[in-house]
Amino acid sequence: KSGETLFKTQSVSKLIAQIAMHKQETVNKIYDPAAGSGSLLLQAKKHFDNHIIEEGFFGQEINHTTYNLARMNMFLHNVNYDKFNIKLGNTLLDPHFGEDRPFDAIVSNPPYSVKWIGSDDTTLINDERFAPAGVLAPKSKADFAFVLHALNYLSSKGRAAIVCFPGIFYRGGAEQKIRQYLVDNNYVETVISLAPNLFFGTSISVNILVLSKHKTEGKTQFIDASKLFKSETNTNVLTDAHIEQIMTLFDTKED
């Protein structure tokens, strides 16, 4: 079962890695704030020869077992121990790598709609990651806290590609205010809607949110890739041809 899960996300991981690294001849380092077993970071390694990622791979993971797995995974894929730095802890409340900022490439599939302390911790609204938006992600849905965290860690030339549930794009309240902040500051480069059933344990169609700090036009690109999939037993997959199609569109900046 777990092997199937891994395979299922492989194609999406490939797409995320390509987006984050798109047209960057070199990136200083690549970071995943919710690293899991390290699969997104390793997918980036697979796609780009080592020399392009100059200072290596960084990630933080909250679950002890998964954190150990991520470190083992790095060794198994021949990433030299001085080329990766995976830390254990809660990214939202106890973030590591502040001194390693900024990152040229950020990839992430953070947990969907998890609870967090949010406004119950009065210091968080003054945290440099969350303060600019003027409001915290709701306590019942930390999704945008991960997004704002990633944005804060992103370099001016870089790009972040984050897997998100569709709800964060249309719900009101604090999430609406955070969306407004992101759009007003021209940080949202592209939103890609993917086909259903591409992702572990959920048949929901997820989206990829692409953040950038170097947009020259005040436009956001929307790509509807919901019809791009190949049906396999119990699951859908993105083929390399589909990924190429999405990347071509992404490059043109057409909707």
Residue ranges and their predicted role:
Residues 100-255:
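A conserved structural/catalytic subdomain of Rossmann-like adenosyl-cofactor enzymes
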Residues 3-108, 113-115, 120-124, 129-134, ...:
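Conserved S-adenosyl-L-methionine
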